[in-house]
Regions:
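Short, small-residue-biased leader/transition segments that mark boundaries at the very start
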Residues: 3-8
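Low-complexity basic/metal-binding stretches
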Residues: 10-11, 261
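Short, solvent-exposed loop/edge-beta patches enriched in aromatic
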Residues: 16-24
Length: 281
C-alpha cells in the first residue's frame, strides 16, 4: 500500500498527518495554547521559526515515501503552495490528491456555511462608485492582456462591489467568488442572502449572481481564455479546474493597488474610524 499524507491548513497553523504520525505547525502566537491543547495526544507540535524545526514542505518531502500520495482539500490550500506540493510529489514519483474534503466526511456536527445578510456600502463612505471601480479593473485587464479575471479575495470583492457582510465574525465580508470579463461581472454567492434591494443594486451595476457552488464548474468552461488571477490567493482547486487550453496570468489582483490608493472620502472615514476606536471604552 502506498503511504499517504494529508495536509490541513487553517489560519492558525498547518497539520500534516501520515499513516503513523501527526504534526501541527504553528507560530509563536500559539506555542503555549497549542502545547496545552495537544497534551496527552499523539500529535507533535512543531514550533515554526525555531532552530532545527523543519518547515511543512521540508517535513513532507522528508517523510513522503517513493510513489506516495499527498492529499488535501483543494479549496483550502492556495495555488502556489499546491504547485509546490505537486513538485514534491513528482520528485518521489507520487501524486497529488485534492478532490475530497476528508475532514468534512468525519466532522458530523460541523456548523453550516454562514448565510448572513449582505448590505450595500453607500458611496458616501466608499467615495467611488462600483461602476467606476469595475471599469478601472477592466482597463487593468486590457493592459495585461487578460480576457477573464478570477477574484477570490473576500476583502477585494467587498471593496470592488461596495458591499459588506457578516459571514466572518471579525471581518465584514461575504463568502463568495467573482469572475469579471469586459462584458460580464458574475458574483458567485449563496443566493439566499440576495434580497430585493441588493438584487436591484447589482442589476443597476451590471452584476449577475450565480450559486456559490457553481464557481468551480464555471472555471472549467474557460477554454482558450487568458485568465488573470493571483495563485497566492486563489485555491488549488480553482487552478486545477482551469482547462488545459486556458492561459494563466499569475499576478497581483488589480484591486490590491487600487485599494491602497485611497480617495479623500476613504481617507476621511478611515481617520474618523481610528479616532472612534481610540476613544472606545
Amino acid at each position: 500500500r502506498r503511504q499517504r499524507q494529508m495536509v490541513i491548513r487553517d489560519r492558525a497553523g498547518t497539520a500534516v498527518i501520515t499513516r503513523t504520525k501527526a504534526g501541527l505547525w504553528t507560530d509563536g502566537r500559539y506555542f503555549v495554547q497549542a502545547a496545552k491543547q495537544l497534551e496527552g495526544t499523539t500529535v507533535t507540535l512543531y514550533r515554526m521559526g525555531e532552530e532545527d524545526v523543519p518547515t511543512v514542505d521540508e517535513y513532507v518531502e522528508q517523510t513522503l515515501k517513493e510513489g506516495g500520495t499527498i492529499g488535501f482539500d483543494g479549496r483550502v490550500v492556495n495555488g502556489r503552495w499546491g504547485a509546490k506540493l505537486q513538485q514534491i510529489a513528482e520528485k518521489k514519483h507520487g501524486k497529488l490528491y485534492v478532490q475530497e474534503d476528508l475532514i468534512g466526511q468525519i466532522w458530523k456536527d460541523r456548523p453550516p456555511m454562514s448565510k448572513e445578510p449582505v448590505w450595500i456600502l453607500d458611496e458616501a463612505y466608499s467615495g467611488r462608485s462600483t461602476k467606476d471601480k469595475l471599469a478601472a479593473v477592466r482597463e487593468k485587464m486590457k493592459e495585461k492582456g487578460a480576457e477573464v479575471h478570477l477574484l477570490a479575495s473576500l476583502y477585494d470583492i467587498a471593496w470592488l462591489l461596495n458591499v459588506r457582510g457578516n459571514d466572518i465574525s471579525y471581518v465584514p465580508v461575504v463568502l463568495s467568488y467573482l469572475a469579471l470579463t469586459q462584458e460580464q461581472c458574475i458574483w458567485f454567492l449563496q443566493e439566499e442572502v440576495v434580497d430585493d434591494t441588493l438584487r436591484e443594486y447589482l442589476q443597476k451595476n451590471g452584476i449577475t449572481t450565480r450559486p456559490y457552488e457553481a464557481f468551480y464548474e464555471y472555471v472549467k468552461t474557460l477554454e482558450n481564455q487568458t485568465i488573470l488571477l493571483n495563485r497566492a490567493v486563489v485555491n488549488t482547486k480553482i487552478c486545477n479546474n482551469l482547462p488545459e487550453s486556458a492561459q494563466m496570468i499569475d499576478a497581483e489582483d488589480p484591486t490590491l493597488e487600487m485599494k491602497a490608493d485611497k480617495n479623500e472620502t476613504a481617507i476621511s472615514n478611515t481617520t474618523k474610524a481610528h479616532l472612534k476606536d481610540a476613544f472606545a471604552k
